[in-house]
Design a protein with these regions (language model features):
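Conserved phosphate- and dinucleotide-binding cores of soluble alpha/beta proteins
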Residues: 3-7, 58-217
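N-terminal active-site beta-alpha-beta segment that forms phosphate/nucleotide-binding
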Residues: 1-76
């Protein structure tokens, strides 16, 4: 399981270019910062109030540096700290290029459900609703299924975070773009066939004529 999540995080890291300002959600998205190439600078934003997230802290963490999910993280030397109002002003003002989020379900039209399973206690919506509305790109990183049940649906069954917001989905099986006419597979991991990824997906997938092999490195 860990290797599959690493695969997803490594591939997501390839989405960004030098100078990008990107929000990282909690969970799997935090791993993306670990795999940014050394020759580019990508500034990662955390909505609890800082820009300059680096890798997750594994030893002797600074207890004053946590991300929005409460995980200890490290910070780059150029880190900037600010209050929550300014943080969400950056998001709502469209100054954050993309957000990387996890998901429970994604619908074929780009609807996202990632904040609650009815009947289970959660802390609250968090910043996901604002991020989905304010960021030009919403990239979902997740395992393709949950205990064999497809997470990419015809229609979400869980309460929505936002409607028609997802632009790209990256799973262990491939990379998919959400377009007006559905979900298109643009990269397929060599471990899987077209039939495999379709069988693990509830909605119909479309395969881009220029589809290539999913690369991790």
């Amino acid at each position: 399981m860990a290797d599959l999540k690493t695969r997803i995080a490594k591939r997501c890291a390839k989405e960004f270019q030098d100078g990008d300002f990107v929000n990282l959600g909690i969970g799997l998205p935090t791993q993306v910062a670990d795999y940014i190439p050394d020759d580019i600078i990508v500034t990662f934003h955390s909505e609890n109030g800082f820009a300059g997230i680096d890798a997750v802290a594994t030893e002797n963490p600074d207890v004053d540096i946590i991300n929005s999910g409460g995980t200890y993280v490290t910070a780059v030397p150029r880190v900037k700290y600010f209050d929550t109002a300014e943080s969400f002003g950056l998001v709502r003002g469209g100054h954050v290029k993309a957000t990387v989020l996890g998901a429970m379900e994604v619908a074929e039209n780009g609807d996202l459900a990632n904040w609650i399973i009815p009947g289970k206690k959660v802390a609250g919506m968090g910043g996901a609703m604002d991020l989905c509305a304010g960021c030009p790109e919403v990239i979902i990183v997740m395992l393709h299924t949950q205990k064999g049940t497809p997470k990419i649906k015809k229609k979400c069954s869980l309460p929505l975070t936002a409607e028609k917001c997802v632009s790209k989905i990256i799973t262990e099986m491939g990379v998919m773009e959400v377009r007006e006419d559905g979900i298109w597979v643009t990269e397929l991991h060599p471990d899987y066939t077209k039939e495999d990824i379709q069988a693990a997906t509830e909605c119909e997938l479309h395969f881009d004529p220029n589809m290539k092999a999913m690369e991790e490195e």
